[in-house]
Amino acid sequence: TGTHCDAPRHVMEYEFDGKRARYTHEMPADAYAGEAIVFKIDIEPWGLITDKHLDACMKEYGLKDGDLKGKILCLNSGMHRYFDDSKAYYHYAAGTGIDAGKWFVKQGVKCVAMDGQALDHPLHTAMGNNGMTRMNLLGATGKTIVEEYKELFGEEAYAEFDKFEYIRIHGQEAYDEKFGDLENIGVWGTWEPCHKEMLGHGIVGVENL
């Protein structure tokens, strides 16, 4: 798809305040518009954008906690250069995860715009082993993208994207510490966790910026 906006109802039935998740037309009129800042993220394709990348941008731009409150944050990961109906743009995109989502909430931004196929890393989506469909798509080598990722980065790195692998490797307690706030509101922790952290706190999203 082209550039589009996400509202809470896209990924959840209830927001963190316990109220029914809102549709786009129920969001404030200024939720998607306002003063914006662009972070140029130093990340390779298929990389996971974390709070560490975002903290590095804050330092580089001379920003401090609180400076982004109420603003729109645009992420330039370089993925826009690959825009196409292709594996390079979809299967192997850089993207965010739970740590970035919590960071956005902490900083109080009102909208996050991503220059890639989704806010979340592709392995956090149904392209990998998440969601009702769990497609685990074939990659460029003819193997699944899960197999490819494990071969390149190892099982522990992959576990970040897979609830059952995370629990197997790190244990239930570690999983609950990292993803428990999502599970507590009835959503699957490793399935688009950045979306859910943001949108569940009323922070809207833009994809394919």
Features from the language model and the residues they span:
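Active-/binding-site microenvironments in catalytic and ligand-binding cores
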Residues: 1-209
